[in-house]
Design a protein with these regions (language model features):
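Hydrophobic ligand-binding cavity/cleft-lining segments
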Residues: 33-96
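Hydrophobic/aromatic beta-strand elements that line small-molecule binding cavities or substrate pockets
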Residues: 66, 98-101, 127-133, 168-176
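A short, structured loop/turn motif at beta-sheet edges
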Residues: 72-73, 101-106, 132-140, 174-183, ...
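Short beta-edge strand/loop motif at the mouth of beta-sheet-based domains
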Residues: 83-126, 130
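Beta-strand/loop substructures that line and gate deep hydrophobic ligand-binding cavities in soluble
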Residues: 141-145, 151-205
């Protein structure tokens, strides 16, 4: 199976809004026994916001850190402005025809990506979630999962995912200014099946590659 990114996001991505300036609705066209996902997010958010030195990660948490040659305001915008998200969302070869973002704590998002024709005939896939905590230019915590175009959760098996693919993943994005560049740390908490964590890591990595290309074009 080829890679499909559950996030982000991201969380959506999440996964996975330009509420950099103002909030509002903006749309275009584990291992068990460890701390809770919320507790881990707050642990990450201390001090430098999720730098490797302050992180106590569970074995199957997914963590990717990238340094982008762009100011933190622009990298933040790349995740919070629907038009900007559409420029890079999805793994290599995928496009993002639409994006809906209500960037505020408790607000919802729906990220849309379309597979290339050679992969599942150009199938449309959606990731939706809710923003849990926002620290401007520093931290975004959110839930994310596969959904329909309206943001309603779907059974992952209906789009070809394994039966044990998680319905929802707690996630976070941390932003840190490093000189004139921005360090971004993307985290997806509590993956319980290793190969699916690896699959999401590959997809998220390709998304961030495309983000770097979009940022280079400003």
């Amino acid at each position: 199976m080829k890679t499909i990114h559950n996030a982000t996001l991201v969380v959506f991505v999440a996964l996975a809004a330009s509420a950099l300036v103002a909030s509002g609705d903006k749309s275009t066209s584990a291992e068990t026994g460890g701390p809770s996902a919320k507790a881990r997010a707050y642990n990450h958010a201390k001090g430098n916001y999720m730098t490797a030195a302050t992180v106590n990660l569970e074995k199957r948490d997914l963590v990717i850190t990238r340094l982008f040659d762009a100011p933190v305001e622009l990298v933040w915008k790349a995740w919070t402005d629907p038009d900007y998200v559409m420029r890079w969302w999805g793994p290599k070869g995928f496009t993002s025809p639409s994006c809906k973002i209500d960037f505020r704590e408790g607000g919802k998002f729906v990220f849309h990506m379309r597979a290339p024709k050679e992969f599942q005939g150009g199938q449309d896939m959606y990731t939706s979630g809710v923003y849990k905590k926002i620290v401007p230019l520093k931290l975004i915590e959110f839930s994310q999962g596969l959904s329909d175009k309206d943001g309603n959760r779907i059974d992952p098996t209906t789009i070809g995912m394994p039966a044990d693919f998680p319905g929802e993943i707690p996630s976070a994005l941390a932003f840190k200014l490093v000189g004139n560049k921005t360090e971004l740390t993307a985290i997806e908490y509590g993956w319980t099946v290793g190969h699916m964590r690896d699959m999401s890591e590959a997809g998220l990595g390709e998304c961030l590659d495309k983000l770097a290309e979009a940022l280079a074009k400003r």
